[in-house]
Amino acid sequence: MLMTRGVLDGEPKRWSCLCAYDGTEFAGWQKQPNGHAVQDKIEEALEKIFGSPVRTIGSGRTDAGVHAIGQVFHFDAPWMHPLQSLLQAMRTYFPTGISPLELKEETNDFHALLAARGKRYRYRLCLVWAMHEADRSVYSLKEKKVNLAAMQEAAKHFIGEHDFSAFSVSRGEDEKLESKARKVWKVEVLEEKEEVQVVVEGSGFLYKMV
């Protein structure tokens, strides 16, 4: 279903969308040549709604297989009907595994990437062999022993601003001049029932750093 011209008349507006996705079947957030990234699928859905290509800009990138519960992106497009009807159209056309949660009209100077205040990663490690097969966000350690105190002590050394080049993977010549220093605000190692959760927060991270 394409929207009628009357719906799309007028000046483009800037929209921000908060979305969540199961990254298992996707090649990360950023557009890929194979067209199977989250951003690719979102732009395909928006083109179906608006009848012409729509460019999106995300607040950050995730690697292949990584899930997100608070990814923000923005795009420009005209819309003459209530905001809620656009959100409903997005929920209709977005593919399985990608969920638009909230939609806002922004001022034209809003930029999802520049407005991002920080990023949080959470790793869930199951300590027992059995776990729910449906929960693909948990990695099973299959009853391997975990020294929680040692992990918590090691976590302290990552807090602060450091050169994290040893923890990243280079993506080519374009990164030679990029600073490898990043500021990590918090690293927590928590025991939650039969899980160990590792939470890392910072202003931003290098490629494959976390």
Q: Where do the model's predicted regions map?
A:
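Structured-RNA-binding interfaces characteristic of tRNA pseudouridine synthases
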Residues: L2-M209
